[in-house]
Design a protein with these regions (language model features):
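Short Cys/His-rich Zn2+-coordinating modules
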Residues: 136-148, 162-167
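Short cysteine-rich clusters marking metal-coordination/redox-active sites
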Residues: 160-164, 181-184
Length: 193
């Protein structure tokens, strides 16, 4: 694993800037991997890990910098719960740990660095030096993944009988005997014009 400073450089390049959320995400991922005993996430351990993130904010961009998990590799999963939290799943040992940022860490950053007026700078400095137990709560959990959720899954591709678009990874819906994509089954996030 790299140093926090090295990860910060990589995170800033990936995200476009460095902020408190990035440092939080980096430390969260480092902690999660330490708990699981994964030492080389981009080396020998790269196929052992699936990570679930729970928010679409800065911390989520930092987590893959440490873990190597990517959406396109099917090793990064997004579940929108609006929480600065992530669950790190070791596929080799079937162990998983959920790590969540403590809300109290913001106040602790103010206590540690009262001389810094800029809140983001204050939190960045605080998150760099805080004890991991002051930054995060963690809980051992079980995450049950179907085979279609694993990296490398090569399931059958279906075709939506309504729009004709292809559907991968068992994401189809069957309604009245018809195979539909989720959009045509009514789960659109957009409205056709």
């Amino acid at each position: 694993m790299r140093t926090l400073a090295e990860y910060e450089e990589l995170a800033a390049a990936a995200h476009g800037h460095l902020c408190a959320g990035q440092i939080l995400g980096l430390r969260m991922a480092i902690f999660g991997l330490e708990l699981l005993g994964i030492q080389e996430p981009e080396g020998k351990d790269r196929k052992r890990l699936v990570t679930f993130v729970e928010i679409d904010r800065c911390a989520t961009d930092a987590i893959p910098v440490v873990t190597g998990c990517r959406l396109g590799k099917r090793a990064l999963k997004f579940r929108d719960f609006g929480k600065v939290a992530a669950t790190f799943c070791d596929l080799e040992t079937a162990r998983a740990v959920r790590v969540a940022a403590r809300e109290s860490s913001k106040a602790l950053a103010r206590e540690l660095f009262p001389e810094i007026c800029n809140r983001n700078e204050q939190q960045m400095q605080g998150y760099r030096v805080m004890r991991v137990e002051d930054l995060f709560a963690h809980q051992w959990v079980r995450v049950e993944l179907g085979p279609e959720e694993f990296p490398g899954y090569k399931g059958a591709r279906r075709v939506c009988e309504e729009c004709g678009e292809g559907i991968s990874f068992e994401r189809q819906v069957v309604e009245n005997g018809r195979t539909l994509c989720r959009h045509c089954a009514g789960a659109r996030y957009y409205t056709p014009l």
